[in-house]
Amino acid sequence: MDGHAVHKVNFTIGDSVSWSAGGARSYRRTAEGLPAHYAQLFDRYMVSDIVLFGDCRPIHRPAVDLAKVRGVRTHVFEEGYFRPYWVTLERGGVNAYSSLPKDPRWYRESARSVPKYKNGDQFKSPFWVRATHDVLYNFWAGLNPLFYPGYVSHVPYSPASEYWHYVRRSIKVMRRQKPDAESIRIVVERAKDRPYYLLPLQLSSDAQIRFHSEFKDMEDVLETTLRSFASHAHQNTILVIKNHPLDPGFTDYEALVKSLAREFAIEDRVVYLETGHLPTLLSHTSGVVTVNSTVGGSALVHDCPTIALGRAMYDMPGLTFQGPLDDFWRKIEAPDKSLFRDFRNVVIHTTQVNGGFYCRHGIDMAVRNAIPVMTALDSQLERLAKRG
């Protein structure tokens, strides 16, 4: 990369097969040996920077911790905070580990010196391309115990089991498209007389739930939210629960929601959706309840009152409700539009790269736009801090 030496560490056969640029070495032992292994690599190659995708996995944390001690710069890629045409690239950490401040005044002041961003250059990223990448990467997973005996996946289920459940759920999603679209039409049509709140589900296996919230899984989130809604929301309001589009279907959320609704005596006030058009729901809802999903950012784009139950980079006074969930249902506070505009521009300027991970054009854009960010002496966030 621009004359820089790159040394990659492979942890699985998928890593090995996917990398053809050279300079790779395989780590086959257990995670307990990683701190010493990384220290050896740092010393041998005089490492100045490390590059990760995500920063919560067991194979990543020892590298991040060592980098902090050694004064090595950490560049973390992640899905975009403002999708679909941006990816995240931050120094130090992403999401709840981000270095972005939580002070609204800082965003208002910093916004004066950054450009006004639109949605970025667009590109097409068909889902089948992403699925193909995933299948090709995991095709070799069954051989990992033989060639990488120390590796333990951060995902709690095997690729084969995951794909089988995806197939089953895809059939369910196809069957539910028309009924769910009709449910959305009815809910939206009646929203003036029967306001609704929206709870978009996240993936239980996501690091956002496991590391950046106090919830153990989405079942815990559902029970907490429905219990609070039943006890504290106005009787004429509805709670709409929408499943995550990439949920593999290990948990029957529809059955769970029905069971909890019966338990809390709100069966006629809860609507469960397996699929559906999220922007339509966001355009008419009275409020959004999320743990820390990027849907929270989309809710702010739609000027929706929003509460984040976990640790989210957008959770701050003026953007999200700062009180407890029990109070949220009756104390609706819309986000400050001007603050959100400033927040969005600053976040894009300091952490977002125009591009994508799952199609050739998007990848080429991301690489081209990421190189100057990674090779700069100071990050955009550091430059803003110096100006302040």
PLM region spans:
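N-terminal subdomain of nucleotide-sugar transferases
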Residues: 1-12
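Active-site and donor-binding regions of nucleotide-sugar-utilizing enzymes
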Residues: 11-107
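Donor nucleotide-activated moiety binding/catalytic core segment of transferases
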Residues: 29-45, 245, 250-294, 301
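Structural motif
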Residues: 48-49, 196, 238, 287
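A donor-sugar binding/catalytic signature common to diverse glycosyltransferases
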Residues: 49-59, 274-320
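Active-site-proximal region of nucleotide-activated glycan assembly enzymes
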Residues: 75-174
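Leloir-type glycosyltransferase catalytic cores
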Residues: 100-146, 319-388
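Conserved catalytic-core segment of nucleotide-activated headgroup transferases in glycan assembly
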Residues: 148, 152-256
